[in-house]
Amino acid sequence: MQVILLEKIAKLGSLGSIVNVKPGYARNYLIPQGKARRVTEKVIAEFEAQRAELEKKQSEILAAASAQAARLDGLLVQISQKAGVDGKLFGSVTSANITEELRKQDFPVEKSMIRMPEGQIKQIGDYTVTVVLHSEVSAHITVSVLGETTI
């Protein structure tokens, strides 16, 4: 199915691109989320009329994401978990835990924005985690996992 993108989508295309996608992806995700429209002559004409407005909106979103990335970059997030004497956690620290801590510090992020290259954290220590705020903007934060040892 051919769709015209109304915003930049990572690994798919930029604003105004006409791309072929699987019908289910278009019907269930892109079109309901307002990220794309099915290609017809009428839709292309409407898009060209709204192009400047859409580009302005996208640049505002990018500027807001860049501002938030500047605030987030280098931030230290401390998370306490129960751990054994060897430093191994009982359980693990996931992207949901990191999201919760960031929200406590007034950073509105979603769980899907957190990228943990090593997967879930299972040891005490400091870890670098990436927060993807926009397809072009990301910030690196340090997650410090502290152990609450039980004796």
From Swiss-Prot:
Gene Ontology biological process terms in this record: translation
UniProt cross-references to Gene3D superfamilies, sorted A to Z: Ribosomal protein L9, C-terminal domain, Ribosomal protein L9, N-terminal domain
NCBIfam families documented for this protein: L9 (TIGR00158)
Superkingdom of origin organism: Bacteria
Record Pfam families: Ribosomal_L9_C, Ribosomal_L9_N
Protein's name according to its UniProt entry: Large ribosomal subunit protein bL9
PANTHER family tied to this protein: 50S RIBOSOMAL PROTEIN L9 (PTHR21368)
Cross-referenced SUPFAM superfamilies: L9 N-domain-like, Ribosomal protein L9 C-domain
Gene that produces this protein: rplI
UniProt family annotation: Belongs to the bacterial ribosomal protein bL9 family.
Keyword tags: Ribonucleoprotein, Ribosomal protein, RNA-binding, rRNA-binding
InterPro entries, per the entry: Ribosomal_bL9, Ribosomal_bL9/RNase_H1_N, Ribosomal_bL9_bac/chp, Ribosomal_bL9_C, Ribosomal_bL9_C_sf, Ribosomal_bL9_N, Ribosomal_bL9_N_sf
GO molecular function: rRNA binding; structural constituent of ribosome
GO CC annotations on file: ribonucleoprotein complex; ribosome
Protein function: Binds to the 23S rRNA.
